[in-house]
UniProtKB/Swiss-Prot annotation:
It comes from Salmonella arizonae (strain ATCC BAA-731 / CDC346-86 / RSK2980). Coiled coil: none annotated. The chain crosses the membrane at residues 23-43, 52-72, 97-117, 120-140, 144-164, 202-222, 238-258, 303-323, 357-377, 391-411, 447-467, 475-495. GO terms for molecular function: sodium:proton antiporter activity. Na(+)/H(+) antiporter that extrudes sodium in exchange for external protons. The keyword Cell inner membrane applies. Pfam families: NhaB (PF06450). The gene is nhaB. This is Na(+)/H(+) antiporter NhaB. Its main location: membrane. The keyword Cell membrane applies. Disulfide bonds: none annotated.
Amino acid sequence: MEISWGRAMWRNFLGQSPDWYKLALLVFLIINPLTFFTNSFVAGWLLVAEFIFTLAMALKCYPLLPGGLLAIEAVVIGMTSAAHVREEVAANLEVLLLLMFMVAGIYFMKQLLLFIFTRLLLSIRSKMVLSLAFCVAAAFLSAFLDALTVVAVVISVAVGFYGIYHRVASSRGEENDMLDDSHIDQHYKTVLEQFRGFLRSLMMHAGVGTALGGVMTMVGEPQNLIIAKAAGWHFGDFFLRMSPVTVPVLVCGLLTCMLVEKMRWFGYGETLPEKVRNVLQQFDDQSRKQRTRQDKIKLIVQAIIGVWLVTALALHLAEVGLIGLSVIILATALTGVTDEHAIGKAFTESLPFTALLTVFFSIVAVIIDQHLFAPIIQFVLQASEHAQLTLFYLFNGLLSSISDNVFVGTIYINEAKAAMENGAISLKQFELLAVAINTGTNLPSVATPNGQAAFLFLLTSALAPLIRLSYGRMVWMALPYTIILTLVGLLCVEFTLAPVNEWMTQAGWLATLS
């Protein structure tokens, strides 16, 4: 018997999301207009809380859908205007171009990145050194590339290696289902569990590495570019101004990586089983023998394009998104990718998040129009200049650990810039606050997958169920990093940021403030 029209519509609404989630969103959509016409300030904060809820529940439904419905309703009832949303999008066009073109550009360099991580995995036998190598490699790559892409590459390596061993363990060849362990002997299952633990720890080290490297440069994370644009900084300026905080944090993050591996704390310390290593080594040897001269040329070309990418970013030869577009053109033209559909696949990773970011800007427009953050900013600005840095760092860190750091960073940098333009703070103080905001959004946000887009991407990937990486386990494994990164970042903002920036200005490394 066919279901009723109403039931069919209910099932279609937000698809496979739980019924309670669908009901919650409908309640939000009903109460928002009623609240807005009663008290617009309360309604604005209600909308922000609801939007953060959709980000926190990203595993139930991709936030673009519920967040988009809330944003559309906000425009319709007059919480903001379509014109203001367009202004916010136009002001942040560079960030959208970064996500569209840079992520797609790096997609065409995946062969080189896969080659690098495969070499690391098979050539380093010490688990501590290997973990450190993955963390450092992810940090370095994330300083110049998008963190999502770096994590996507490491996921590709892990899924590939897991699949190779799982096929051998199940003896089912190409028909093997990686989610099905029923055909695997108990002995192989024990080895497989150890392999899962090994991959979990490597993925977490790589994920944290993207945060350690991503905070250091203006292209490492989308919000970095928003903050850099607001402060008028180029690539070199951004790196130098962040370094009093980011360099000590990087060192302490790497020491944490070594410590948790050595002590086998928080689920770390599993080594690569020798039986698995032998299987993977045989497969890699076979792959290398089958690599043609054409394949080798592709790797060389991708390496040269990588050098161009780093050089162009460091010298600020063009806007970040346009440099990404140049990578797409060079990588496709010189490696023979000419089919439209093959090129189109490169954009599938970035466009949903680009659309979600556009929805963020709609919520930001509401925050500006309804003056939602005015009381918080006034409270912070009443403190001494030194205390302002700590408060901005802590407020950003708290919100970023439960919400998306792009959203939080955008809100706070806009408010800080408005305070400077209104004469509430000096240009010098604004630039220090920009560092506090950037580090506050990037470092404590490793606490949960909600805060870091790369972590959320890992949690929702095909790899997570294979290696038994749940939300709770991810939070637990991130805990030592969360504590160390947050505390070291806070101490650096408190004690080293202002004096080191002053010293660099006097040394002529930074432009003298007018």
